[in-house]
């Protein structure tokens, strides 16, 4: 298959850290994935082509590959090559970061950085954490430090996140010399900078319109205020109706929470200046998350 040949040659040329035998087995796993169309250990083992080996031994072969500590160490080189290939023409790429559930068991959760290209999300870097570390500063700092090693040195990315990422995340991103764009919700408090009394975000919502509005430079939070620019925007209603089947617990309270969240205006915050990027452009960038 031509695509596997190109992939093998690229990894052989740009990732010399990977041992030849491990690289060959990795290509066997890639071909098995294409044949199986399902990424599980047993499916990979059962769909290895061109071998007379018993299925049990093929599954064990995939198990050894996935658990190989050398391959886990060498995967950083693959991420670096992939990021360099994707971002070579971008000096300030927009990188979307979010948590993603691991469906089996819910013991692990993935934190993923991706780039949106022509309506499609392509992963730049991801790693898993125990579920108890979801949203913690420990996980965020570790992820950002590893992401810095993956990205080329000559770029300054714009990191886009949802309302689950707060001031400690923004400070860490800024410490790395990057730009950030996020959303604040709920009981977040701000005050106009440099002088002004404190306001709740909900007091701003009536001012939101379909045209993005620059609120101004604000100090976010009270105890450890973070200076940033704030943009307010209300997206037009999409006319969606809650028509879930009664067999899928359509009366669960979470449904009403999701509906209220979808109707809330966007309060976006960033360390970019309005001269560098207009309010409407910031809204357009944030919409790439959807």
Which residues are covered by each model-predicted region?
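Residues within the helices of the helix-turn-helix
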Residues: 42
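Short, basic interhelical loop/turn and adjoining N-cap
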Residues: 48-61
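Single, function-defining residue in the core of a domain
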Residues: 1-38, 46, 77-78, 90-93, ...
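Nucleic-acid substrate recognition interfaces
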Residues: 34, 50, 68
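Active-site-proximal, Lys/Arg-enriched surface segment
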Residues: 59-118
């Amino acid at each position: 298959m031509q695509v596997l040949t190109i992939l093998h040659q690229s990894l052989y040329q740009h990732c010399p850290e990977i041992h030849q035998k491990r690289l060959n087995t990795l290509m066997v796993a890639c071909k098995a994935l294409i044949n199986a169309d399902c990424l599980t250990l047993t499916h990979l083992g059962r769909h290895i082509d061109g071998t007379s080996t018993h299925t049990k031994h093929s599954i064990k072969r995939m198990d050894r590959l996935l658990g190989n500590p050398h391959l886990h160490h060498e995967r950083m080189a693959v991420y670096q090559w992939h990021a360099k290939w994707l971002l070579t023409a971008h000096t300030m790429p927009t990188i979307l970061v979010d948590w993603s559930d691991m469906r089996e068991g819910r013991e692990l959760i993935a934190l993923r950085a991706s780039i949106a290209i022509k309506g499609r999300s392509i992963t730049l870097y991801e790693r898993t954490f125990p579920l108890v570390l979801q949203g913690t500063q420990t996980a965020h700092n570790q992820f950002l430090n590893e992401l810095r090693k993956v990205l080329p040195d000559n770029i300054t990315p714009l990191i886009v996140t949802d309302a689950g990422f707060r001031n400690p995340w923004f400070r860490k991103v800024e410490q790395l010399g990057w730009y950030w764009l996020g959303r604040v919700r709920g009981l977040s408090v701000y005050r106009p900078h440099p002088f002004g009394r404190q306001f709740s975000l909900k007091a701003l919502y009536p001012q939101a319109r379909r045209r993005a509005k620059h609120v101004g430079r604000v100090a976010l939070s009270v105890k450890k205020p973070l200076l940033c620019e704030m943009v307010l925007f209300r997206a037009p209603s999409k006319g969606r109706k809650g028509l879930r089947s009664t067999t899928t617990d359509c009366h669960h309270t979470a449904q009403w929470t999701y509906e209220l969240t979808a109707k809330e205006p966007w309060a976006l915050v960033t360390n970019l200046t309005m001269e560098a990027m207009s309010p409407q452009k910031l809204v357009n960038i944030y919409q790439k998350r959807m």
